Amino acid sequence: RERVFIGSSSEGIPVAEAIHKELDAHSELVVEPWYKKSKFKLSRSYLDSLMGILDDHDLGVFVLSPDDSKTMRHKRMRTPRDNVVFELGLFMGRHGCGRAFMVTQKGVPDSWIPSDLKGIHAVSYDPKPQHRAQAVSQVCETILEQLAGERSYTWLTEWRSRSGVYHEQLILSKRAVAN
């Protein structure tokens, strides 16, 4: 079973909880949001704890809710928390972009994310509570589709690798019988 880490700001917890509930319904996943049990250990730095989280999880889902505002080039912009963007970057670096999912809020004028992330496809949700369940369900469906496609590719690669080994064993056994 694959272990999924969900990262968000405190303000993003309602969306993270909805994602947790949706993904947790799939038996092939073990879903662990940052706020459920302490992922950050006593007497350790946050960075040390994050490195442990990277080791313990196969993929991450990060809610980049626009909780902060910053002035960028004389314009006020709404931004996700720096720590959530940092954690996303750590997961991308360790597990690859295909296993670190960005979840963004739809319809935020003047929103900003680091330019290096703008070319990476994110899934979006409707922030209104009355639409959240359906929106998050669609977000999770997109993530699960990507994982299913990745698994079938992994299965094919493993099958090809095994079939090559079986083929070699067959040739060697035929040679042994012939001698």
Residue ranges and their predicted role:
Residues 1-60, 94, 175-179:
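Conserved N-terminal substructure of TIR/SEFIR domains
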Residues 8-9, 65, 103-107:
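Cofactor-binding loop segments of dinucleotide-utilizing enzymes, especially the Rossmann-like FAD-
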Residues 39-43, 68-74, 109:
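Short, solvent-exposed loop/turn segments at secondary-structure junctions
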Residues 44-47, 51-54, 81-88, 133-140:
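Amphipathic alpha-helical transducer elements in NTP-driven molecular machines
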Residues 66-93:
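Conserved TIR/SEFIR loop-to-helix hotspot centered on a Trp-containing motif
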Residues 96-112:
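Nucleic-acid nuclease catalytic cores
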Residues 111-178:
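C-terminal interaction surface of TIR/SEFIR-family domains
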